[in-house]
Amino acid sequence: MINKNISIQINGEPFNCSEPLSLQFLLNYLDFNSERIAIEINSTLLPERLFHSTYINDQDKVEIITIVGGG
């Protein structure tokens, strides 16, 4: 079996993994609360309902935007 490393960028920082990851798995791994974020993959805003079924591919650029309430 060939093990292909996947290289992506998360908020402009390099991130490597040894297998494809679902976006939801990545968010859990990075300890993000998926209810308070917006995600762009390659400049496309992704609806929360697709987090479980979307997989990160080699060379993807992921932007995780944290939504902060205030007053």
From Swiss-Prot:
GO terms for cellular component: chloroplast. This is Uncharacterized protein ycf40. InterPro entries: Beta-grasp_dom_sf, Mopterin_synth/thiamin_S_b, Thi_S, ThiS/MoaD-like. Belongs to the ycf40 family. The keyword Flavoprotein does not apply. It comes from Porphyra purpurea. SUPFAM superfamilies: MoaD/ThiS. It is found in: Plastid, Chloroplast. Keywords: Chloroplast, Plastid.
